Amino acid sequence: MRLRKKAWTNEFLNQHTYYLIKYDKKINLNEIFLNNNPTCLEIGCGKGQFLTTLALKNPNLNYIGMEKSSTITAIGLKKSLKEFQNNSKKMTNIKYLNKYAENLLEIFYTDSFSRIYLNFSDPWPKARHYKKRLTYLGFLDIYSDILIKNGFLEFKTDNDSLYNFTLEQLKLTNKWEIISNTLDLYNDQELLKDNVPTEYETKFHLANKNIYKIVIKNLK
């Protein structure tokens, strides 16, 4: 169900523009973060739990959370600011971007990111909507362009159809190499040891749903 826009959204975002990416040309990430640390991108960052946990854990990495809903962007940013405050840390390595994945190439240069995360993306179950799925070949080509060579993309889902679709799309390209692939993340100790759960993931795991995960390397 689509979340209705909250009345406070615009005011909150306008008060916190420092943490929002605005652009009229392609973005230089070194200028955005005022450093040259590697940058990771979460596409569809939801309410920010995953992004915030990683940013707190890895202060020498930069993180961008991309979300198409302005209200969810605001909720995520609010959560990030609160968690950093609770940990007595200044939030310097997270920025939020309220845009669609279709806009990636007009926003970012080639080789901008070291890692991309796709967590529990909309499966778009109707066959006619297959090009909207974030692991459709057209999107995979975009990710390959904005990732550095040998950079990684991590994909998690509870949806078996989207998981199988993703594997089929990967067969259509030679730009990627599958590094890890599991049908049950919580019974894969190697992948689980560094796993950071999302809000949805925790909910699905508690409901005894399998979590699928694929990690792929960008071969360019």
From Swiss-Prot:
Gene3D superfamilies: Vaccinia Virus protein VP39
Active site annotation, chain numbering: 122
InterPro entries: SAM-dependent_MTases_sf (IPR029063), tRNA_(Gua-N-7)_MeTrfase_Trmb (IPR003358), tRNA_methyltr_TrmB_bact (IPR055361)
Assigned keywords, A-Z: Methyltransferase, S-adenosyl-L-methionine, Transferase, tRNA processing
GO CC annotations, alphabetized: tRNA methyltransferase complex
Record-listed E.C. numbers: 2.1.1.33
Binding locations of S-adenosyl-L-methionine: 42, 67, 122
Catalysed reactions listed for this entry: guanosine(46) in tRNA + S-adenosyl-L-methionine = N(7)-methylguanosine(46) in tRNA + S-adenosyl-L-homocysteine
Function: Catalyzes the formation of N(7)-methylguanine at position 46 (m7G46) in tRNA.
UniProt xrefs under PANTHER family: 3-DEOXY-D-MANNO-OCTULOSONIC-ACID TRANSFERASE/TRNA GUANINE-N 7 - -METHYLTRANSFERASE, PENTACOTRIPEPTIDE-REPEAT REGION OF PRORP DOMAIN-CONTAINING PROTEIN
Family: Belongs to the class I-like SAM-binding methyltransferase superfamily. TrmB family.
Protein name stated in the entry: tRNA (guanine-N(7)-)-methyltransferase
Source organism of this protein record: Mycoplasma capricolum subsp. capricolum (strain California kid / ATCC 27343 / NCTC 10154)
